[in-house]
Amino acid sequence: DDISVPERLERQSEFMEDNPQIGVCGTWIQLIGKYNGIAELETEDDLIKIKLLTNQNLAHPSVMIRKQILENYKLSYSISYTVAQDYDLWVKMFDHCSFANLPEPLLKYRVHEKQNSRKVVEQNSAEGNKVLTNLLIKMGLQLNDSDLIIHNKIFSGIGINSVTIDKTLSYLIRLRSSNIRKK
């Protein structure tokens, strides 16, 4: 029950026509229902892609995808995922095109109770971790058993303690090096 504003498709189509390097174009969203407000998502390619390391920065219901990118690279949603299909697709598209979000709320996104049920959150976390692992490997990072735990602690705001500070620093240095090599 999301609601597109009448001019959404026109604005996104025009933007993609003017920017042929953009393969994925989303928009800011207006939250309605349980929460209200504007989700001001990153608008620039580099920042959107960096945010893929921490969470998604594309509102899937607002996204327009360039069909040619999907066809050229034989990309599609994976049936392996039930709640992280979009995140997985963004990771697959990561190397093949640029991403953008239009800086205006062109979709009204309803937030409801069932989205935050324990089962959905756990499933989202498990599937999200699998996709995140694929992204980190794609970036050239050699993962060890504690890396994903450290990554999630850092980027979820849980934080780290003095016992894990050396491992955390080592992980962040390796992550930065992988990112520099990948560029």
Regions found by a protein language model. Give the residues of each.
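Generic alpha-helical structural signal
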Residues: 10, 126-130, 173
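Conserved nucleotide-sugar donor-binding catalytic segment
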Residues: 27, 41-147, 155
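Conserved donor NDP-sugar-binding/catalytic core segment of glycosyltransferases
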Residues: 7-39
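Short, intrinsically disordered, charge-balanced linker/junction segments flanking boundaries
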Residues: 1, 14, 18-21, 69-70, ...
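Membrane-interface aromatic/basic loop that binds lipid-linked glycans or pyrophosphate carriers
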Residues: 1, 133-139, 154-183
